[in-house]
Amino acid sequence: MLESRLAKNIARIVQARKPYLISYHVRASTQNALLKQTVLQSSSFKSFPTLPRLAARNISNSGILSRTTPVIIKQISMVRSYSSGDVENPEILNKNESNQSSGVKRAMPFRVLKKMKSFLFKQNKPLTVDNVTAFFSWWLVSHIVWIVVGTTTFFSLLLYTLNTVSAQELLGRWIGQLMTKNTGFQFVFESAIVPNWRKGLITFNKISVIRRPDTLNGIGAQNPNNKSDYEKEYMALRKRYDSNEEPDTEALSQGNYTQFELSIDKADVSFSFARFLNGKGIVKELQLKGVRGVVDRRFIEWDPSSDPRDYRRKHNWGDFEIEKFKLEDLRVTLLQPKGFRKFPVSVFFCELPRLRKQWLFYDLMNAKTLTGSFDNSMFTIHRLQLRPYSPYLKVGKQLDDMRHSRLRIDNVAIDHLNRGVSGAFGWINDGSVDFLVNISFPSEPSENSFQKAWISLMDKLKKKEKDEDVYKDVHFDVNVQLHNPKAVIPIFTNQVSYINNALIRPIIAYINSTRTFIPILCHVSKPLSDFDGSWTFYDSGVLQEISAQVYESFARDVLNQEIRRKRIQKVGYWSLRRFLHLVLVSLQELAPTTSSISNFE
Protein backbone atom coordinates (compact mmCIF):
# COMPACT_ATOMS: atom_id res chain seq x y z
CA MET A 1 0.00 0.00 0.00
CA LEU A 2 2.81 2.36 0.95
CA GLU A 3 4.85 1.49 -2.12
CA SER A 4 1.97 2.18 -4.46
CA ARG A 5 1.33 5.57 -2.86
CA LEU A 6 4.98 6.52 -3.09
CA ALA A 7 5.19 5.34 -6.68
CA LYS A 8 2.33 7.64 -7.62
CA ASN A 9 4.02 10.61 -5.92
CA ILE A 10 7.35 9.79 -7.56
CA ALA A 11 5.63 9.73 -10.94
CA ARG A 12 4.14 13.13 -10.16
CA ILE A 13 7.62 14.43 -9.16
CA VAL A 14 9.17 13.15 -12.37
CA GLN A 15 6.47 14.84 -14.46
CA ALA A 16 7.00 18.15 -12.60
CA ARG A 17 10.80 17.85 -13.04
CA LYS A 18 11.60 19.61 -9.80
CA PRO A 19 14.54 18.78 -7.51
CA TYR A 20 13.36 16.98 -4.37
CA LEU A 21 15.12 15.93 -1.25
CA ILE A 22 14.18 12.39 -0.22
CA SER A 23 15.00 11.17 3.24
CA TYR A 24 14.57 7.63 4.40
CA HIS A 25 14.41 7.09 8.14
CA VAL A 26 14.47 3.49 9.27
CA ARG A 27 13.62 2.58 12.85
CA ALA A 28 14.18 -0.88 14.19
CA SER A 29 11.16 -2.31 15.95
CA THR A 30 13.31 -3.71 18.72
CA GLN A 31 15.42 -0.62 19.69
CA ASN A 32 13.20 2.29 18.53
CA ALA A 33 16.27 4.33 17.41
CA LEU A 34 17.59 5.92 14.18
CA LEU A 35 19.96 3.58 12.39
CA LYS A 36 20.65 5.22 9.09
CA GLN A 37 19.95 8.50 7.22
CA THR A 38 20.68 9.10 3.60
CA VAL A 39 19.95 12.24 1.67
CA LEU A 40 19.77 12.05 -2.08
CA GLN A 41 19.20 14.89 -4.53
CA SER A 42 18.09 14.17 -8.04
CA SER A 43 15.82 15.45 -10.76
CA SER A 44 14.99 12.07 -12.25
CA PHE A 45 14.13 8.66 -10.81
CA LYS A 46 14.33 6.67 -14.02
CA SER A 47 17.32 4.74 -12.73
CA PHE A 48 15.34 3.54 -9.67
CA PRO A 49 12.05 1.96 -10.79
CA THR A 50 11.02 0.74 -7.33
CA LEU A 51 11.54 2.06 -3.83
CA PRO A 52 12.72 -1.24 -2.27
CA ARG A 53 15.57 -1.39 -4.77
CA LEU A 54 16.41 2.26 -4.01
CA ALA A 55 16.39 1.57 -0.27
CA ALA A 56 18.47 -1.56 -0.71
CA ARG A 57 21.15 0.36 -2.65
CA ASN A 58 21.45 3.20 -0.16
CA ILE A 59 21.02 1.45 3.20
CA SER A 60 23.56 -1.19 4.10
CA ASN A 61 22.62 -3.90 6.56
CA SER A 62 19.04 -2.74 6.55
CA GLY A 63 17.38 -5.97 7.67
CA ILE A 64 13.59 -6.25 7.74
CA LEU A 65 11.85 -2.91 7.32
CA SER A 66 9.20 -2.17 9.87
CA ARG A 67 5.76 -1.18 8.73
CA THR A 68 6.01 1.86 11.01
CA THR A 69 9.01 3.27 9.08
CA PRO A 70 8.25 6.86 8.03
CA VAL A 71 9.33 7.88 4.56
CA ILE A 72 9.52 11.66 4.02
CA ILE A 73 9.73 13.40 0.67
CA LYS A 74 10.71 17.07 1.00
CA GLN A 75 10.86 19.84 -1.59
CA ILE A 76 13.03 22.85 -0.85
CA SER A 77 10.01 25.06 -0.23
CA MET A 78 7.57 22.52 1.24
CA VAL A 79 7.39 19.26 3.26
CA ARG A 80 5.32 16.22 2.44
CA SER A 81 5.36 13.19 4.76
CA TYR A 82 3.94 9.79 4.28
CA SER A 83 3.64 7.23 7.04
CA SER A 84 2.03 3.89 7.63
CA GLY A 85 0.42 4.98 10.84
CA ASP A 86 3.05 6.28 13.28
CA VAL A 87 3.26 9.94 14.23
CA GLU A 88 6.42 11.67 12.92
CA ASN A 89 9.07 12.66 15.40
CA PRO A 90 9.55 16.51 15.35
CA GLU A 91 13.19 16.25 16.43
CA ILE A 92 13.98 14.16 13.39
CA LEU A 93 12.24 16.66 11.09
CA ASN A 94 14.14 19.66 12.50
CA LYS A 95 17.42 17.81 12.26
CA ASN A 96 16.71 16.82 8.71
CA GLU A 97 15.85 20.38 7.75
CA SER A 98 19.12 21.74 9.18
CA ASN A 99 21.16 19.02 7.48
CA GLN A 100 19.43 19.63 4.17
CA SER A 101 19.97 23.44 4.33
CA SER A 102 23.66 22.99 5.12
CA GLY A 103 23.93 20.53 2.26
CA VAL A 104 22.38 23.07 -0.11
CA LYS A 105 24.87 25.70 1.00
CA ARG A 106 27.77 23.34 0.45
CA ALA A 107 26.45 22.47 -2.98
CA MET A 108 26.26 26.11 -4.20
CA PRO A 109 29.92 26.38 -5.36
CA PHE A 110 29.57 23.15 -7.29
CA ARG A 111 26.43 24.50 -8.95
CA VAL A 112 28.27 27.67 -9.97
CA LEU A 113 31.18 25.68 -11.37
CA LYS A 114 28.79 23.44 -13.23
CA LYS A 115 27.02 26.43 -14.78
CA MET A 116 30.35 28.00 -15.76
CA LYS A 117 31.45 24.74 -17.29
CA SER A 118 28.20 24.51 -19.22
CA PHE A 119 28.57 28.13 -20.42
CA LEU A 120 32.23 27.85 -21.43
CA PHE A 121 32.37 24.36 -22.90
CA LYS A 122 28.70 23.91 -23.89
CA GLN A 123 28.70 20.37 -22.56
CA ASN A 124 28.24 18.36 -19.36
CA LYS A 125 30.91 15.80 -20.11
CA PRO A 126 34.01 15.49 -17.94
CA LEU A 127 36.82 17.93 -18.80
CA THR A 128 39.63 16.71 -21.00
CA VAL A 129 43.17 17.95 -21.55
CA ASP A 130 42.10 19.63 -24.80
CA ASN A 131 39.39 21.57 -22.97
CA VAL A 132 41.79 22.77 -20.29
CA THR A 133 44.54 23.76 -22.76
CA ALA A 134 42.04 25.54 -25.01
CA PHE A 135 40.66 27.50 -22.07
CA PHE A 136 44.15 28.41 -20.86
CA SER A 137 45.21 29.47 -24.37
CA TRP A 138 42.10 31.62 -24.73
CA TRP A 139 42.76 33.22 -21.35
CA LEU A 140 46.43 33.88 -22.15
CA VAL A 141 45.79 35.33 -25.63
CA SER A 142 42.99 37.56 -24.37
CA HIS A 143 45.23 39.02 -21.67
CA ILE A 144 48.05 39.58 -24.15
CA VAL A 145 45.66 41.43 -26.47
CA TRP A 146 44.38 43.42 -23.50
CA ILE A 147 47.92 44.42 -22.49
CA VAL A 148 48.88 45.43 -26.06
CA VAL A 149 45.68 47.29 -26.95
CA GLY A 150 44.64 48.66 -23.58
CA THR A 151 47.96 49.04 -21.79
CA THR A 152 46.83 52.01 -19.71
CA THR A 153 43.66 50.22 -18.62
CA PHE A 154 45.62 47.13 -17.61
CA PHE A 155 48.12 49.11 -15.55
CA SER A 156 45.29 51.19 -14.07
CA LEU A 157 43.52 48.10 -12.78
CA LEU A 158 46.81 46.68 -11.54
CA LEU A 159 47.69 49.87 -9.68
CA TYR A 160 44.18 50.18 -8.30
CA THR A 161 44.36 46.62 -6.99
CA LEU A 162 47.75 47.18 -5.39
CA ASN A 163 46.60 50.43 -3.81
CA THR A 164 43.54 48.77 -2.31
CA VAL A 165 45.71 46.23 -0.51
CA SER A 166 47.83 48.97 1.12
CA ALA A 167 50.89 48.42 -1.07
CA GLN A 168 51.37 52.04 -2.15
CA GLU A 169 54.79 52.44 -0.58
CA LEU A 170 56.02 49.14 -1.98
CA LEU A 171 54.67 49.99 -5.43
CA GLY A 172 56.27 53.45 -5.43
CA ARG A 173 59.60 51.99 -4.34
CA TRP A 174 59.45 49.31 -7.04
CA ILE A 175 58.62 51.76 -9.85
CA GLY A 176 61.26 54.19 -8.61
CA GLN A 177 63.96 51.53 -8.59
CA LEU A 178 62.90 50.32 -12.04
CA MET A 179 63.08 53.81 -13.59
CA THR A 180 66.32 54.56 -11.76
CA LYS A 181 67.91 51.43 -13.19
CA ASN A 182 66.73 52.09 -16.75
CA THR A 183 67.43 55.85 -16.98
CA GLY A 184 70.29 56.45 -14.56
CA PHE A 185 68.28 59.20 -12.86
CA GLN A 186 67.10 58.84 -9.29
CA PHE A 187 63.28 58.71 -9.11
CA VAL A 188 61.31 59.01 -5.88
CA PHE A 189 57.52 58.50 -5.76
CA GLU A 190 56.33 59.74 -2.40
CA SER A 191 52.56 59.85 -2.85
CA ALA A 192 50.00 57.37 -4.11
CA ILE A 193 49.89 56.21 -7.73
CA VAL A 194 46.24 56.15 -8.72
CA PRO A 195 44.44 55.72 -12.06
CA ASN A 196 42.45 58.59 -13.53
CA TRP A 197 39.47 56.77 -15.04
CA ARG A 198 37.86 59.87 -16.53
CA LYS A 199 40.89 60.91 -18.61
CA GLY A 200 42.22 57.40 -19.14
CA LEU A 201 45.55 58.27 -17.51
CA ILE A 202 47.62 57.17 -14.52
CA THR A 203 48.45 59.91 -12.02
CA PHE A 204 51.79 60.14 -10.20
CA ASN A 205 51.96 62.69 -7.38
CA LYS A 206 55.04 64.28 -5.82
CA ILE A 207 57.91 62.97 -7.91
CA SER A 208 61.57 63.80 -7.44
CA VAL A 209 64.05 63.39 -10.31
CA ILE A 210 67.75 63.78 -9.53
CA ARG A 211 70.84 63.40 -11.68
CA ARG A 212 74.09 63.74 -9.80
CA PRO A 213 77.35 61.79 -9.70
CA ASP A 214 76.28 59.80 -6.64
CA THR A 215 73.10 58.65 -8.41
CA LEU A 216 74.98 57.64 -11.55
CA ASN A 217 77.50 55.66 -9.53
CA GLY A 218 74.73 53.84 -7.71
CA ILE A 219 75.41 55.39 -4.28
CA GLY A 220 72.26 57.43 -4.11
CA ALA A 221 70.15 54.77 -5.78
CA GLN A 222 70.57 52.26 -3.00
CA ASN A 223 67.93 53.88 -0.83
CA PRO A 224 66.02 56.22 -3.15
CA ASN A 225 62.71 56.11 -1.31
CA ASN A 226 63.22 57.44 2.19
CA LYS A 227 59.64 58.50 2.74
CA SER A 228 60.22 60.01 6.16
CA ASP A 229 62.77 62.55 4.93
CA TYR A 230 61.47 63.10 1.43
CA GLU A 231 58.32 64.98 2.38
CA LYS A 232 60.31 67.59 4.29
CA GLU A 233 62.80 67.93 1.44
CA TYR A 234 59.99 68.18 -1.08
CA MET A 235 58.17 70.97 0.74
CA ALA A 236 61.43 72.83 1.40
CA LEU A 237 62.36 72.49 -2.28
CA ARG A 238 59.05 73.94 -3.48
CA LYS A 239 59.15 76.73 -0.92
CA ARG A 240 62.69 77.68 -1.88
CA TYR A 241 62.06 77.77 -5.63
CA ASP A 242 58.65 79.41 -5.42
CA SER A 243 60.20 82.32 -3.54
CA ASN A 244 62.92 84.71 -4.68
CA GLU A 245 65.61 83.08 -2.58
CA GLU A 246 68.72 81.76 -4.26
CA PRO A 247 68.87 77.98 -4.67
CA ASP A 248 71.31 75.95 -2.67
CA THR A 249 73.61 74.13 -5.10
CA GLU A 250 76.60 73.41 -2.88
CA ALA A 251 75.79 69.70 -2.80
CA LEU A 252 76.19 69.34 -6.55
CA SER A 253 79.43 67.58 -7.43
CA GLN A 254 81.61 68.05 -10.45
CA GLY A 255 80.92 66.17 -13.69
CA ASN A 256 81.07 66.87 -17.41
CA TYR A 257 77.33 66.57 -17.99
CA THR A 258 74.15 68.43 -17.13
CA GLN A 259 73.09 67.84 -13.54
CA PHE A 260 69.66 68.62 -12.18
CA GLU A 261 67.41 68.22 -9.19
CA LEU A 262 63.72 68.53 -10.05
CA SER A 263 60.48 68.06 -8.17
CA ILE A 264 57.24 67.39 -10.06
CA ASP A 265 53.95 68.04 -8.35
CA LYS A 266 51.81 65.90 -10.66
CA ALA A 267 52.35 63.72 -13.72
CA ASP A 268 49.61 62.07 -15.81
CA VAL A 269 50.83 59.23 -18.02
CA SER A 270 49.27 56.81 -20.49
CA PHE A 271 51.10 53.72 -21.73
CA SER A 272 51.12 51.77 -24.97
CA PHE A 273 52.74 48.36 -25.12
CA ALA A 274 52.42 48.33 -28.92
CA ARG A 275 54.63 51.44 -29.17
CA PHE A 276 57.12 49.78 -26.84
CA LEU A 277 57.35 46.80 -29.18
CA ASN A 278 58.01 49.21 -32.08
CA GLY A 279 60.92 50.79 -30.21
CA LYS A 280 59.16 54.10 -29.49
CA GLY A 281 58.98 53.85 -25.72
CA ILE A 282 56.09 52.73 -23.58
CA VAL A 283 54.87 56.28 -22.77
CA LYS A 284 52.14 57.44 -25.15
CA GLU A 285 50.89 60.62 -23.47
CA LEU A 286 52.50 62.75 -20.76
CA GLN A 287 51.22 65.74 -18.79
CA LEU A 288 53.38 67.50 -16.20
CA LYS A 289 52.35 70.14 -13.67
CA GLY A 290 54.31 72.06 -11.08
CA VAL A 291 57.99 71.51 -11.95
CA ARG A 292 60.60 73.16 -9.73
CA GLY A 293 64.32 72.67 -9.41
CA VAL A 294 67.86 73.48 -10.48
CA VAL A 295 69.63 72.64 -13.76
CA ASP A 296 73.39 72.85 -13.32
CA ARG A 297 75.66 73.11 -16.37
CA ARG A 298 78.61 74.75 -14.61
CA PHE A 299 80.95 71.79 -15.01
CA ILE A 300 80.39 71.18 -18.73
CA GLU A 301 83.47 71.56 -20.91
CA TRP A 302 83.75 71.52 -24.68
CA ASP A 303 86.27 72.28 -27.40
CA PRO A 304 85.42 75.56 -29.21
CA SER A 305 87.18 74.33 -32.36
CA SER A 306 85.04 71.20 -32.60
CA ASP A 307 82.21 70.89 -35.08
CA PRO A 308 78.75 71.44 -33.54
CA ARG A 309 77.49 68.44 -35.49
CA ASP A 310 79.66 66.20 -33.31
CA TYR A 311 77.37 66.93 -30.36
CA ARG A 312 74.29 65.50 -32.04
CA ARG A 313 73.07 62.32 -30.43
CA LYS A 314 72.64 58.99 -32.17
CA HIS A 315 69.29 57.26 -32.28
CA ASN A 316 68.87 54.26 -30.01
CA TRP A 317 66.15 51.65 -29.90
CA GLY A 318 63.60 52.56 -27.28
CA ASP A 319 63.99 56.37 -27.46
CA PHE A 320 60.70 57.89 -26.38
CA GLU A 321 58.29 59.28 -28.98
CA ILE A 322 55.40 60.80 -27.06
CA GLU A 323 52.27 61.43 -29.11
CA LYS A 324 50.93 64.19 -26.87
CA PHE A 325 52.85 66.30 -24.37
CA LYS A 326 51.64 69.04 -22.02
CA LEU A 327 53.58 71.07 -19.49
CA GLU A 328 52.26 73.62 -17.02
CA ASP A 329 53.92 75.75 -14.37
CA LEU A 330 57.64 75.07 -14.78
CA ARG A 331 60.28 77.19 -13.10
CA VAL A 332 63.92 76.15 -12.87
CA THR A 333 67.15 77.97 -12.12
CA LEU A 334 69.76 77.50 -14.85
CA LEU A 335 73.44 77.61 -13.92
CA GLN A 336 75.80 78.13 -16.88
CA PRO A 337 79.52 77.33 -17.15
CA LYS A 338 82.51 79.70 -17.11
CA GLY A 339 81.16 81.88 -14.32
CA PHE A 340 78.09 83.06 -16.18
CA ARG A 341 75.35 84.48 -14.00
CA LYS A 342 72.46 82.24 -13.00
CA PHE A 343 69.01 83.08 -14.32
CA PRO A 344 65.49 81.63 -14.12
CA VAL A 345 63.68 79.82 -16.93
CA SER A 346 59.90 79.47 -16.77
CA VAL A 347 57.30 77.78 -18.92
CA PHE A 348 53.72 78.84 -18.29
CA PHE A 349 52.05 76.47 -20.73
CA CYS A 350 53.35 74.13 -23.39
CA GLU A 351 51.44 71.82 -25.72
CA LEU A 352 53.25 69.70 -28.27
CA PRO A 353 51.59 67.41 -30.83
CA ARG A 354 54.52 65.05 -30.35
CA LEU A 355 57.80 64.98 -28.49
CA ARG A 356 60.60 62.77 -29.77
CA LYS A 357 63.94 62.30 -28.09
CA GLN A 358 65.79 62.23 -31.41
CA TRP A 359 64.03 65.38 -32.72
CA LEU A 360 63.71 67.32 -29.46
CA PHE A 361 64.63 70.80 -30.76
CA TYR A 362 62.58 70.38 -33.93
CA ASP A 363 59.47 69.33 -31.99
CA LEU A 364 59.84 72.25 -29.57
CA MET A 365 59.88 74.72 -32.46
CA ASN A 366 56.86 72.94 -33.94
CA ALA A 367 54.80 73.40 -30.77
CA LYS A 368 51.13 74.29 -30.91
CA THR A 369 51.54 76.69 -27.99
CA LEU A 370 54.59 77.50 -25.89
CA THR A 371 54.72 80.51 -23.58
CA GLY A 372 57.27 81.32 -20.92
CA SER A 373 60.18 83.51 -19.92
CA PHE A 374 63.94 83.21 -20.36
CA ASP A 375 65.95 85.36 -17.95
CA ASN A 376 62.85 87.56 -17.45
CA SER A 377 62.42 87.88 -21.23
CA MET A 378 59.06 86.74 -22.54
CA PHE A 379 58.97 84.26 -25.41
CA THR A 380 56.14 82.60 -27.31
CA ILE A 381 55.82 79.96 -30.02
CA HIS A 382 52.47 79.52 -31.73
CA ARG A 383 51.01 78.27 -34.99
CA LEU A 384 50.07 80.80 -37.67
CA GLN A 385 46.65 80.56 -39.26
CA LEU A 386 47.74 82.33 -42.47
CA ARG A 387 50.93 81.93 -44.45
CA PRO A 388 53.24 84.88 -43.77
CA TYR A 389 54.78 86.79 -46.63
CA SER A 390 58.34 85.77 -47.44
CA PRO A 391 60.36 87.29 -50.30
CA TYR A 392 62.69 84.29 -50.26
CA LEU A 393 60.12 81.59 -51.11
CA LYS A 394 58.08 81.23 -54.27
CA VAL A 395 54.35 80.89 -54.04
CA GLY A 396 53.18 77.41 -54.95
CA LYS A 397 51.06 74.49 -53.93
CA GLN A 398 53.81 72.88 -51.90
CA LEU A 399 54.47 76.15 -50.09
CA ASP A 400 50.81 76.36 -49.14
CA ASP A 401 51.02 72.87 -47.63
CA MET A 402 53.88 73.86 -45.34
CA ARG A 403 53.22 74.49 -41.67
CA HIS A 404 54.12 77.90 -40.27
CA SER A 405 54.98 78.93 -36.73
CA ARG A 406 56.19 82.14 -35.14
CA LEU A 407 58.85 82.52 -32.47
CA ARG A 408 58.99 85.80 -30.60
CA ILE A 409 61.49 86.75 -27.88
CA ASP A 410 61.49 90.23 -26.39
CA ASN A 411 64.36 92.06 -24.73
CA VAL A 412 66.94 89.27 -24.57
CA ALA A 413 70.25 90.27 -23.05
CA ILE A 414 73.02 90.19 -25.63
CA ASP A 415 75.34 88.17 -23.36
CA HIS A 416 73.23 85.07 -24.07
CA LEU A 417 74.18 85.35 -27.77
CA ASN A 418 77.83 86.42 -27.74
CA ARG A 419 79.17 83.56 -25.59
CA GLY A 420 81.26 81.23 -27.73
CA VAL A 421 79.88 82.61 -31.00
CA SER A 422 82.05 84.20 -33.67
CA GLY A 423 80.81 86.97 -35.88
CA ALA A 424 78.75 90.09 -35.29
CA PHE A 425 77.05 88.80 -32.13
CA GLY A 426 80.47 88.04 -30.67
CA TRP A 427 81.56 91.66 -31.12
CA ILE A 428 78.57 93.19 -29.34
CA ASN A 429 79.08 93.24 -25.58
CA ASP A 430 76.16 95.39 -24.48
CA GLY A 431 72.52 95.89 -25.42
CA SER A 432 69.35 93.86 -25.87
CA VAL A 433 67.80 92.02 -28.80
CA ASP A 434 64.25 91.35 -30.00
CA PHE A 435 63.67 88.33 -32.22
CA LEU A 436 60.71 87.75 -34.50
CA VAL A 437 61.20 84.52 -36.46
CA ASN A 438 58.72 83.01 -38.90
CA ILE A 439 59.47 79.31 -39.27
CA SER A 440 58.20 77.25 -42.21
CA PHE A 441 58.23 73.48 -41.74
CA PRO A 442 57.91 70.97 -44.58
CA SER A 443 54.62 69.12 -44.67
CA GLU A 444 54.64 65.65 -43.21
CA PRO A 445 51.96 62.99 -43.69
CA SER A 446 50.36 61.52 -40.62
CA GLU A 447 52.06 58.60 -38.93
CA ASN A 448 51.14 55.08 -40.06
CA SER A 449 49.36 56.47 -43.11
CA PHE A 450 49.41 55.09 -46.62
CA GLN A 451 50.58 58.46 -47.93
CA LYS A 452 53.73 58.35 -45.81
CA ALA A 453 54.56 54.84 -46.95
CA TRP A 454 53.98 55.76 -50.58
CA ILE A 455 56.15 58.88 -50.38
CA SER A 456 58.93 56.93 -48.68
CA LEU A 457 58.79 54.30 -51.40
CA MET A 458 58.85 56.87 -54.20
CA ASP A 459 61.83 58.64 -52.61
CA LYS A 460 63.78 55.42 -52.74
CA LEU A 461 62.81 54.57 -56.31
CA LYS A 462 63.50 57.90 -57.96
CA LYS A 463 65.49 61.00 -57.29
CA LYS A 464 63.84 64.23 -56.25
CA GLU A 465 64.02 67.16 -58.62
CA LYS A 466 66.15 70.13 -57.67
CA ASP A 467 63.27 72.60 -57.52
CA GLU A 468 61.58 70.39 -54.92
CA ASP A 469 64.56 70.24 -52.59
CA VAL A 470 63.70 73.66 -51.18
CA TYR A 471 60.54 72.24 -49.68
CA LYS A 472 62.53 69.64 -47.73
CA ASP A 473 64.24 72.44 -45.82
CA VAL A 474 63.21 74.39 -42.74
CA HIS A 475 63.10 78.12 -43.46
CA PHE A 476 63.66 80.91 -40.94
CA ASP A 477 62.68 84.49 -41.77
CA VAL A 478 64.51 86.36 -39.02
CA ASN A 479 63.77 89.91 -37.94
CA VAL A 480 66.37 91.09 -35.41
CA GLN A 481 66.11 94.43 -33.66
CA LEU A 482 69.12 95.64 -31.68
CA HIS A 483 68.47 98.14 -28.90
CA ASN A 484 71.33 100.31 -27.61
CA PRO A 485 74.13 98.05 -28.90
CA LYS A 486 77.78 98.62 -28.14
CA ALA A 487 80.49 96.72 -30.02
CA VAL A 488 84.24 96.31 -29.61
CA ILE A 489 86.95 95.12 -31.97
CA PRO A 490 87.83 91.44 -31.40
CA ILE A 491 91.30 90.77 -30.06
CA PHE A 492 91.92 87.48 -31.85
CA THR A 493 91.58 87.44 -35.61
CA ASN A 494 90.80 83.72 -35.76
CA GLN A 495 87.29 84.58 -34.57
CA VAL A 496 86.65 86.40 -37.85
CA SER A 497 88.54 84.14 -40.22
CA TYR A 498 85.54 83.60 -42.46
CA ILE A 499 85.07 87.29 -43.34
CA ASN A 500 87.10 90.17 -44.65
CA ASN A 501 89.00 91.79 -41.79
CA ALA A 502 88.84 95.15 -43.57
CA LEU A 503 85.11 95.40 -42.81
CA ILE A 504 85.43 94.87 -39.06
CA ARG A 505 86.13 98.47 -38.15
CA PRO A 506 83.42 99.96 -40.43
CA ILE A 507 80.84 97.54 -39.02
CA ILE A 508 81.78 98.29 -35.42
CA ALA A 509 81.77 102.01 -36.19
CA TYR A 510 78.33 101.65 -37.76
CA ILE A 511 77.00 99.77 -34.70
CA ASN A 512 78.37 102.30 -32.24
CA SER A 513 77.13 105.25 -34.29
CA THR A 514 73.57 103.88 -34.47
CA ARG A 515 72.95 103.02 -30.85
CA THR A 516 69.22 103.63 -30.62
CA PHE A 517 67.74 101.05 -32.96
CA ILE A 518 69.19 98.78 -35.67
CA PRO A 519 66.78 96.56 -37.65
CA ILE A 520 68.19 93.48 -39.37
CA LEU A 521 66.35 91.20 -41.81
CA CYS A 522 67.80 87.89 -42.93
CA HIS A 523 66.80 84.42 -44.12
CA VAL A 524 68.18 81.05 -43.05
CA SER A 525 67.45 77.68 -44.65
CA LYS A 526 68.48 74.45 -42.97
CA PRO A 527 68.02 70.91 -44.27
CA LEU A 528 65.64 68.79 -42.28
CA SER A 529 68.43 66.30 -41.61
CA ASP A 530 70.34 68.91 -39.57
CA PHE A 531 67.71 68.63 -36.84
CA ASP A 532 68.10 64.87 -36.53
CA GLY A 533 69.70 64.43 -33.11
CA SER A 534 69.98 68.15 -32.29
CA TRP A 535 68.71 69.46 -28.95
CA THR A 536 69.78 73.15 -29.04
CA PHE A 537 70.34 76.08 -31.39
CA TYR A 538 74.06 75.37 -31.20
CA ASP A 539 74.28 71.75 -32.37
CA SER A 540 71.63 72.32 -35.06
CA GLY A 541 73.75 75.09 -36.61
CA VAL A 542 70.92 77.63 -36.60
CA LEU A 543 72.73 80.07 -34.30
CA GLN A 544 75.87 80.05 -36.48
CA GLU A 545 73.80 80.63 -39.62
CA ILE A 546 71.92 83.53 -38.03
CA SER A 547 75.20 85.07 -36.85
CA ALA A 548 76.64 84.84 -40.38
CA GLN A 549 73.48 86.34 -41.88
CA VAL A 550 73.57 89.17 -39.34
CA TYR A 551 77.14 89.92 -40.40
CA GLU A 552 76.10 90.04 -44.05
CA SER A 553 73.26 92.36 -43.14
CA PHE A 554 75.66 94.62 -41.27
CA ALA A 555 77.99 94.57 -44.27
CA ARG A 556 75.14 95.56 -46.57
CA ASP A 557 74.13 98.34 -44.22
CA VAL A 558 77.69 99.62 -44.04
CA LEU A 559 78.01 99.40 -47.81
CA ASN A 560 74.70 101.17 -48.26
CA GLN A 561 75.79 103.80 -45.80
CA GLU A 562 79.02 104.29 -47.74
CA ILE A 563 77.07 104.47 -50.98
CA ARG A 564 74.71 106.98 -49.44
CA ARG A 565 77.67 109.00 -48.15
CA LYS A 566 79.27 109.06 -51.59
CA ARG A 567 75.95 109.89 -53.14
CA ILE A 568 75.49 112.74 -50.69
CA GLN A 569 79.01 113.95 -51.46
CA LYS A 570 78.30 113.89 -55.17
CA VAL A 571 75.05 115.72 -54.65
CA GLY A 572 76.87 118.24 -52.45
CA TYR A 573 79.60 118.79 -55.03
CA TRP A 574 77.00 119.18 -57.74
CA SER A 575 75.02 121.63 -55.62
CA LEU A 576 78.16 123.61 -54.82
CA ARG A 577 79.14 123.76 -58.49
CA ARG A 578 75.68 124.91 -59.47
CA PHE A 579 75.76 127.55 -56.75
CA LEU A 580 79.16 128.84 -57.87
CA HIS A 581 78.00 128.82 -61.49
CA LEU A 582 74.98 130.91 -60.58
CA VAL A 583 77.18 133.33 -58.66
CA LEU A 584 79.51 133.74 -61.61
CA VAL A 585 76.62 134.22 -64.02
CA SER A 586 75.17 136.83 -61.72
CA LEU A 587 78.48 138.63 -61.54
CA GLN A 588 78.78 138.57 -65.32
CA GLU A 589 75.33 140.06 -65.64
CA LEU A 590 76.19 142.82 -63.22
CA ALA A 591 79.56 143.65 -64.81
CA PRO A 592 78.29 145.60 -67.97
CA THR A 593 75.93 147.68 -65.90
CA THR A 594 78.72 148.77 -63.60
CA SER A 595 80.97 149.79 -66.53
CA SER A 596 78.23 151.89 -68.16
CA ILE A 597 77.57 153.77 -64.95
CA SER A 598 81.24 154.60 -64.56
CA ASN A 599 81.45 155.95 -68.16
CA PHE A 600 78.44 158.20 -67.59
CA GLU A 601 80.09 159.80 -64.64
Swiss-Prot record:
Residues 156-601 are mitochondrial intermembrane. One of its GO terms (cellular component) is mitochondrial inner membrane. The keyword Ligase does not apply. It is a single-pass membrane protein. Residues 67-134 are mitochondrial matrix. The chain crosses the membrane at residues 135-155. Signal peptide: none annotated. Residues 1-66 form a transit peptide. Its main location: mitochondrion. Involved in the organization of the mitochondrial membranes and the global structure of the mitochondria. Also required for mitochondrial distribution and mobility as well as for the maintenance of mitochondrial DNA nucleoids structures. Belongs to the MDM31/MDM32 family. This is Mitochondrial distribution and morphology protein 31. It comes from Schizosaccharomyces pombe (strain 972 / ATCC 24843). The lineage of its organism: Eukaryota, Fungi, Dikarya, Ascomycota, Taphrinomycotina. The gene is mdm31.
